[in-house]
Regions:
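Basic, often amphipathic N-terminal segments
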Residues: 2-106, 119, 123-202, 218-232
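Interaction-mediating elements
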Residues: 204-205, 211-213
Length: 232
């Protein structure tokens, strides 16, 4: 029996809730729960007013952190089985604490990162990577070539071939991307403004207590398909 789907790739994300989620919808301009664009005209003042330009690259994903990078389904797998496996996985995983979030800049991108990449966070990432790999189709040559252009280290290149993504296991760094690649001048203006805007969220303990299964539609936009608490 063939299961038809409107999604070309799937991923496992942490998608924030509450005030951080509200900020993310306005800042990135995409609501991955409702599957719709969000107009943020006049929502941000300088130096954040040009947020549509600042956030062009991460917009289609919605505010998120990646636990299992986007993948195409194996021909022997289907979406209902993936949905079921997602809930089974979450039922056996414990929440992961990792200190407060902090604004960070790496490679020209602004992101939110935990103050410490805790052992619990590493373990959750590893478990997620391994649990859903049986659903992942192998990368085609175009995917491999595109990733190789990112100047991967030998270990990252090995991970790319084994896991379909270079930034896993020892290379895994939990982060919530907030911008496209920006100039030094742009980052110097934006980061202090974002720190002020997100002061409350940065002052609260950060715990990953739920995950989301997301799907990428034919236009490249990501939608939440399932959410579940980590209840192990």
């Amino acid at each position: 029996m063939t299961h038809q789907t409107m999604f070309k790739r799937y991923a496992i994300y942490f998608v924030p809730k509450g005030e951080l989620a509200k900020f993310g919808r306005a800042w990135l301009g995409w609501d991955c729960h409702k599957g719709q664009y969000i107009s943020s005209e006049n929502a941000f003042s300088e130096p954040l007013a040009d947020r549509e330009y600042f956030t062009k690259k991460p917009r289609k994903y919605g505010l998120h952190a990646t636990l299992k990078a986007p993948f195409r389904l194996q021909t022997t797998q289907n979406e209902p089985a993936l949905r079921s496996a997602f809930h089974g996985f979450c039922n056996h995983q414990k929440p992961a604490a990792s200190g407060n979030l902090t604004l960070s800049e790496r490679g020209g991108f602004i992101s939110l990162r935990p103050q410490t990449q805790s052992a619990a966070l590493f373990e959750l990432g590893k478990n997620c990577l391994e649990a859903f790999d049986p659903f992942r189709a192998s990368l085609d040559q175009n995917d491999l070539n595109r990733r190789r252009n990112a100047r991967l280290s030998p270990r990252q290149n090995d991970f790319l071939h084994q896991w379909g993504y270079p930034y896993v296991l020892q290379e895994f760094q939990f982060h919530i991307t907030l911008s496209s690649r920006l100039s030094i001048l742009q980052r110097e203006k934006i980061i202090p403004a974002l720190k002020n805007l997100l002061a409350h969220e940065l002052d609260c303990p950060f715990i990953i207590a739920h995950l989301a299964l997301v799907g990428e539609d034919r236009n490249g936009q990501f939608h939440i398909l399932e959410e579940a608490n980590l209840s192990g």
